[in-house]
C-alpha cells in the first residue's frame, strides 16, 4: 500500500478522466503534479486542485504532449524536482476518432496509433525506470475495453488499446518483483469530452465514479480494473464469443 500522502504525476490532467483522477487524489491529500499539452488549461486545473486539496501543497504543472516525445523526459524531471521521488504515475491521455474517420484520413489514423500506443509506451518506459530506481511505485495507465476483441466499429482504436494492454501485462510479469505495480484501467463508455456527441450505450459511466474505482484499484494494487464495474461481466462474455458470432455483431 502506498504511504499517504503520495507523490503523484497525472498525464492528461486537464480533461475528462485525468481531471477526475487528479481531483480525487488532491482531495485525499496526495501531492499532485499535472502534465498536459495546454499550459493555460494546466494552470486552471492546478488552481482547481489547490482549492480542493486537503494538504498544504502546491500543485505543479509542466507541458507534456504525447505527440512530441521530446517533451517526456523534461516533464518527468520537472515533476520529480518539485515532488521528490515519484510514487504514482497516472496516464489518461489518448486520442479517439470513429472508425469511419480513421479509414478516410490516413494521417489521423497514423497519429492516433502513434499516440495511443508507441508514444504512450515510450512515456511509460521513462516513468517505469524512475519508479524502479526509487525502489518501486505504481504505473496506472488507461487502456480500454475496445482492446479486448477485434470489433467492427473500433478496428484501429481498438488495435491501439490492445497493444497497450499487452504492454502493461508484460510489465507486470517482468517487473512486479522489482516493486513496480502496473494498473491497467479498461474503461467502457465514460461520459467525457472524448465521447461527446457519441450515442450513450448501456453501462455508461461518469468520470468521477470511474475515478473512485481507479483509486481503489491503485490502493489495492490490482493489475486490471474495469470501469464501470459492469464491464468486467460484459467483457467476460464477449471474450468467449466465437469469431463467426463476432462477425455478425455490429458494435
Question: What residue ranges belong to the model's regions?
Answer:
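Conserved glycine-rich cofactor-binding loop
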Residues: 14-15
Amino acid at each position: 500500500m502506498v504511504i499517504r500522502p503520495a507523490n503523484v504525476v497525472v498525464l492528461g490532467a486537464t480533461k475528462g478522466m485525468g481531471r477526475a483522477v487528479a481531483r480525487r487524489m488532491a482531495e485525499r491529500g496526495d501531492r499532485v503534479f499535472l502534465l498536459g499539452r495546454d499550459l493555460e488549461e494546466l494552470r486552471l486545473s492546478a488552481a482547481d486542485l489547490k482549492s480542493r486539496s486537503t494538504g498544504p501543497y502546491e500543485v505543479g504543472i509542466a507541458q507534456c504532449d504525447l505527440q512530441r516525445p521530446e517533451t517526456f523526459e523534461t516533464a518527468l524531471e520537472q515533476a520529480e524536482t518539485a515532488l521528490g521521488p515519484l510514487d504514482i504515475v497516472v496516464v489518461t491521455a489518448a486520442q479517439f476518432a470513429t472508425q469511419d474517420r480513421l479509414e478516410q484520413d490516413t494521417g489521423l489514423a497514423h497519429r492516433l496509433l502513434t499516440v495511443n500506443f508507441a508514444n504512450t509506451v515510450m512515456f511509460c518506459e521513462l516513468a517505469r525506470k524512475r519508479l524502479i530506481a526509487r525502489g518501486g511505485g505504481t504505473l496506472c495507465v488507461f487502456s480500454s475495453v475496445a482492446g479486448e476483441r477485434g470489433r467492427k466499429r473500433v478496428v484501429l482504436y481498438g488495435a491501439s488499446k490492445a497493444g497497450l494492454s499487452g504492454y502493461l501485462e508484460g510489465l507486470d510479469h517482468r517487473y512486479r518483483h522489482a516493486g513496480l505495480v502496473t494498473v491497467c484501467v479498461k474503461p467502457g463508455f465514460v461520459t467525457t469530452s472524448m465521447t461527446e456527441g457519441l450515442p450513450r450505450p448501456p453501462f455508461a459511466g461518469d468520470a468521477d465514479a470511474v475515478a473512485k474505482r481507479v483509486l481503489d484499484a491503485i490502493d489495492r494494487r490490482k493489475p486490471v480494473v474495469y470501469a464501470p464495474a459492469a464491464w468486467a461481466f460484459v467483457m467476460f462474455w464477449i471474450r468467449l464469443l466465437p469469431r463467426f458470432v463476432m462477425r455478425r455483431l455490429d458494435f
